[in-house]
Curated annotation (Swiss-Prot):
Keywords: 2Fe-2S, Chloroplast, Electron transport, Iron, Iron-sulfur, Metal-binding, Plastid, Transport
Co-factor requirement: [2Fe-2S] cluster
Gene: petF
Residue ranges occupied by any 2Fe-2S ferredoxin-type domain in the UniProt entry: 4-94
Protein source organism: Guillardia theta
Co-factor note (free text): Binds 1 [2Fe-2S] cluster.
Quaternary structure annotation from Swiss-Prot or TrEMBL: Forms a complex with heterodimeric ferredoxin-thioredoxin reductase (FTR) and thioredoxin.
Protein name: Ferredoxin
């Protein structure tokens, strides 16, 4: 099991957390005291949307984002595992629409 550095940045958040490759980014952030937006926790809405600014994630459990949005770097943090050190811009729901 690998652990990656995930930098979270946006709306008063600017922290780097350690996130194992088998833990969702939202869950790891909460465990480390970071309050990020969420609603369904199942990858079926856009409340937790972020944008990958660097690095990569596996969000194959999500069912909301279309291929174009994923191609633009959007990520649902509630169902995203890091696959490298990465930077996520948080609070990006409005950017989806």
């Amino acid at each position: 099991m690998a652990t990656y550095k995930v930098k979270l940045s946006g709306e008063g958040v600017d922290k780097t957390i350690d996130c194992p490759d088998d833990q969702y980014i939202l869950d790891a952030a909460e465990e480390q005291g970071i309050d990020l937006p969420y609603s369904c926790r199942a990858g079926a809405c856009s409340t937790c949307a972020g944008k990958v600014a660097a690095g990569s994630v596996d969000q194959s459990d999500q069912s909301f984002l279309d291929d174009s949005q994923i191609g633009d770097g959007f990520v649902l943090t509630c169902v995203a595992y890091p696959t490298s050190d990465c930077t996520i811009l948080t609070h990006q729901e409005e950017g989806l629409y």
